[in-house]
Amino acid sequence: MTKNLLVELGLEELPAYVVTPSEKQLGEKMAAFLKENRLSFEAIQTFSTPRRLAVRVTGLSDKQSDLTEDFKGPAKKIALDSDGNFTKAAQGFVRGKGLTVEDIEFREIKGEEYVYVTKEEVGQSVEAIVPGVVDVLKSLTFPVSMHWAGNSFEYIRPVHTLTVLLDEQEFDLDFLDIKGSRVSRGHRFLGKETKIQSALSYEEDLRKQFVIADPCEREQMIVDQIKEIEAKHGVRIEIDADLLNEVLNLVEYPTAFMGSFDAKYLEVPEEVLVTSMKEHQRYFVVRDQDGKLLPNFISVRNGNAERLKNVIKGNEKVLVARLEDGEFFWREDQKLVISDLVEKLNNVTFHEKIGSLREHMIRTGQITVLLAEKAGLSVDETVDLARAAAIYKFDLLTGMVGEFDELQGIMGEKYTLLAGETPAVAAAIREHYMPTSAEGELPESKVGAVLAIADKLDTILSFFSVGLIPSGSNDPYALRRATQGVVRILDAFGWHIAMDELIDSLYALKFDSLTYENKAEVMDFIKARVDKMMGSTPKDIKEAVLAGSNFVVADMLEAASALVEVSKEEDFKPSVESLSRAFNLAEKAEGVATVDSALFENDQEKALAEAVETLILSGPASQQLKQLFALSPVIDAFFENTMVMAEDQAVRQNRLAILSQLTKKAAKFACFNQINTK
């Protein structure tokens, strides 16, 4: 006999961008939980709205499958003494399995007999396993979490309700100080609290309270409503996939409607209007059958059609305020002089440790000269490139880009064309930002491609030079995206430019504003984007291995595979954190990392130093990883009993030297502080 399980977590409004990933994660972790507990099922369906995450398991087995396991013990010659009695080795083996020597049998393997015992575990009822779903909810991970009401725990948002039902049976489980019940919350304004009658009645019980729990159904409702508006008004509505996904995660009961604005605003560049509608107001764009932008928009309210006219007027009023700004900036920006704006970039900080935007542009210009030759640009292309490099950031000081920063580069192209620059120069200014995402559009022109590469390379090298290097999951200056952009552009244009030779050439350049440093780190960083051979290996593990000092591809692949293999084991997180802490502190070591045993003040220092001195990574990657993880207790004991940053400089440097020697050896496998254990 099978059953149906429902788990729903009611929360404060979730950020739209975390709803879908969290729903998916809940389904995956529930499936893993059931598999781990030997519970078969027919299907898993997940649900989500801005205020809830839920999962339903149908066709769930009413009990665990029985488990039969065979365990191999010592050889017979060790298990029996000369009198044929079981030795302590045999007795200890069976005792550890919860059995007795009477359960022992002997099996022959390759000519020798060994002790074997068979252990049978009768499966528990599903009711006994269900309380474990609380651990599934606790295991969910989020980009950010928060505390509330003075509690010590944290979660993505405050939790209000927990419903766990096995068919009609209610489980009053505890989760983050919330007592489970069959009560769920309806729509914030249109609905009320309701009791979920059974696992199978979930959607209908909520539907009565103006909540569409199935995101696929909400999406289809939005699409159908938009199509209906299209047919009614004879227009074309752009259903942007990303915008649709965001909107459906902002509403529990969607109702689409069309609003309008004064046609005079259509004189403003289309990109300004589209940005105002899509990016700022979450509106869908409306066009005529020929693709021409119309003075209309589509929005989706979180509710039904009651008082919809008031809602439309409110949305129109908000949009007009945005469009007024756009119209004003478009008119006023045309009075500006490009050369004046470029000069003012001397007063705009690129980064406080790096200098001004103008200095960044000058360095980029010098890089373009080097790249133009390597890329084989024509004389005309080289001239256009030089002009574009001289002015390409000017639009950052325009009013339009100040208000709508998404339009940087786009407005630069429009303003340069109005100023009489060549189309190639104008296009390059727009294209130098490309790609803006991992799979984003690439430049089409050679001039734009070279400018994009040069701009990104100076950005990468400049930040690395002042020590602003990404670590773990932290990349505040989007250097990974910039590096990936460089690699993608080079590949797309078929330019056979050796990256190591190119970087060497760049480090040979001399600038008044900055000296490039940290070349080895830059090479590692770029190589991480070029080398995609690690496939679906988690990103942080890729980076850890590629940041190491061993550049043999076969070794890197094997190391990544070994890390993935053990990443779910219990000792992975504490072991990596121990090594990561050592890596982070070792960066503070000064000069040559030599260790003086005369400066040791405790046994833990001595133990770690000796362990590091005798550490020789050998064998396959899995064996090397075991060697490194075996150091975790020694490292932890060192940190627990040793103040690394001691006041005595000699003692401090000696302790840092121990860590430096450790990390130098460990880096031959991977830089463990690049692995995210959070």
From Swiss-Prot:
Enzyme Commission code(s) on record: 6.1.1.14
Q: Return the InterPro entries for the record.
A: DALR_anticod-bd, Gly-tRNA-synth_bsu, Gly-tRNA-synth_heterodimer
Q: Which GO terms describe its biological process?
A: arginyl-tRNA aminoacylation; glycyl-tRNA aminoacylation
One MF term in the entry's GO annotations? arginine-tRNA ligase activity
* Top EC class for this record: ligase
One Pfam family this sequence matches: tRNA_synt_2f
Q: Where in the cell is it found?
A: Cytoplasm
Reactions catalysed, semicolon-separated, are:
tRNA(Gly) + glycine + ATP = glycyl-tRNA(Gly) + AMP + diphosphate
Please give the SUPFAM superfamilies that the UniProt record associates with this protein: HD-domain/PDEase-like
Question: Cellular component terms, GO, for this chain's entry?
Answer: cytosol
**Keywords in alphabetical order:** Aminoacyl-tRNA synthetase, ATP-binding, Cytoplasm, Ligase, Nucleotide-binding, Protein biosynthesis
Question: Subunit composition?
Answer: Tetramer of two alpha and two beta subunits.
Question: What does the sequence similarity comment in the record state about its family?
Answer: Belongs to the class-II aminoacyl-tRNA synthetase family.
Name of the protein in its database record? Glycine--tRNA ligase beta subunit
Q: What is the lineage of its organism?
A: Bacteria, Bacillati, Bacillota, Bacilli, Lactobacillales
